[in-house]
Amino acid sequence: MPASLAGPPASGPLPLPPPVNYNPALLATAPAMIDGYALLGFDRLAGFPFAPVPFDPATAKPGAPPPSSADQIPATIKRFDHQLAIVTGFMLPTKMEKGLVTEFLLVRSPMMCCYGQVPNMNEWVVVQVPAGVKPLMDIPVSCFGKLHVKEEFDNGYITSIYQLDGEKLTDAKG
């Protein structure tokens, strides 16, 4: 069998290739600050390879914790955990109450939804806005709030590595 068809070596999976926009110098530099908020773009947040460790809770040993993929997140990104940040992207509402969006995915590209390409795990931020905001679809929006850099799981499946406690939302073009 050709080596290319043999699969990964017995020692583990092959390392992930860096993303197209991989820029180690950017990851190492401090972001611009606006009124105490770090300006964090997806060029930085998605600027490293990340792939969740495969795990199927349905076939795992009962009570087994899901494996962590946190070691793939660079320290230069983890340092933004619990920091005030501004992240700009496109709103994809996931929860609404009384006509207002209370939770949404902030995605890198408007093509990363229903009929577009599936984003990488580091190309979205789960934003919680308890008071709710009006839906702003198909235009870039800037979200202000406290960023969390940690794995979130739902029923054993990793669902995000970035979460933001939304304080304010603005139309990025206006």
Where are these regions (language model features)?
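OB-fold and OB-like single-stranded nucleic-acid-recognition modules
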Residues: 1-174
